[in-house]
Regions:
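Periplasmic c-type cytochrome electron-transfer domains
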Residues: 1-332
Length: 332
């Protein structure tokens, strides 16, 4: 008798009314079964070579899927990494590359990076396939979702499906913008919102609070080519001299729970970040034009009063629904 492949439950990403449209015509169509498989894999330490590290080891839901340390050493080698763990949300809108330098074009290819990196999960993909094939539940789930046995290409497809559902769109600010539940912003939050639009929106723009582009925000005056150019930002990918020192703009959403900050986690607090933009900008040939507007002094003037207002508004961008959503939590 011919085996009948189960029908999948197709999923369309929900898009809030204050969010831009999302191009969800993926080569890897979303299904409820694929998303659930991806969630289980995301939290499974079997994905690492020593069976001790999962994706969730560095991407913790309660802090918007980052890890609260500047440079983690939780990977298989216990060596401190060279870049800060980015948060994970609204990735379905990220079409300009992933990682801090855009070195990966999509979530599927991105997953191979940490899986095989000797300092992160240090996994041999052939051995991973063999190990997962020993688990009947995984064998069944992969067969349902992909109609074939477990393959590394389908492992990363499942992870990508789950990560595309990590949507953060329900902060206090969102409810205010959508006129929901009588939510209002107080005077300090409103003042901060105005200041963010005036002083930050050249990069942190739109409903996503990021332009998903690459900028040199004045962290350093020179850019070492040590560690295969990892400190050179986007240049490491494009080899365009105009991209030296440029890193991808992170979203301001959930920023109050995702310390420390920058691609290397150098700033411990939001105050440190604001002080950097006010008085710590390092000039270089590729410094972003928006940081050259201050009468010849690089940076963005931010007074202590303005700093309080900005922080108040940034707190209104914390999405407590997202960081507590059971759909994104460990299924075990």
């Amino acid at each position: 008798m011919e085996e009948i492949t189960p029908r999948l439950t197709n999923v369309k990403l929900p898009v809030a009314s204050n969010f831009p449209a999302v191009d969800d015509d993926f080569d890897n169509p979303l299904s409820a079964e694929g998303i659930e498989l991806g969630r289980r894999l995301f939290y499974d330490t079997k994905l690492s070579g020593n069976n001790r590290v999962s994706c969730a080891s560095c991407h913790r839901q309660n802090i918007a899927f980052t890890d609260a340390v500047a440079l983690t050493n939780i990977g298989v080698s216990a060596r401190k990494l060279d870049r800060h763990t980015p948060s994970l949300f609204n990735l379905a809108w990220s079409k300009t590359g992933l990682f801090w330098d855009g070195g990966s074009t999509n979530l599927e290819s991105q997953a191979f990076g940490p899986l095989t990196n000797p300092d992160e999960m240090n996994q041999n993909l052939t051995e991973l396939e063999a190990e997962l094939k020993q688990i009947p539940d995984y064998v069944k789930r992969f067969k349902v979702v992909f109609g074939e046995e477990i393959k590394s290409a389908n492992i990363v497809k499942s992870l990508a499906q789950f990560q595309r559902t990590l949507i953060s769109d329900n902060a206090k600010y969102d409810k205010y913008i959508r006129n929901e539940d009588g939510v209002i912003l107080n005077d300090l939050e409103l003042a901060g919102m105005k200041l963010v639009k005036e002083k930050c929106a050249s990069c942190h723009s739109g409903a996503l609070f990021t332009d998903n582009q690459y900028h040199n925000n004045g962290l350093d005056a020179s850019f070492s080519d040590d560690h295969e150019g990892i400190f050179q930002g986007r240049f490491r990918v494009t080899f365009n001299p105009n991209d030296l020192g440029k890193f991808k703009t992170p979203s301001l959403r959930n920023v109050m729970v995702t310390a420390p900050y920058m691609h290397d986690g150098r700033f411990n607090t939001i105050d440190d970040v604001l002080d950097h933009y006010n008085s710590g900008i390092q000039a270089s040939a590729t410094l972003d034009q928006s940081l050259k507007q201050n009468a010849g002094n690089p940076g963005i003037p931010i007074s202590s009063t303005e700093k309080l207002a900005i922080k108040s508004f940034l707190s209104a961008l914390t999405d407590h629904t997202f960081i507590n959503n059971k759909k994104f939590s460990n299924p075990n």
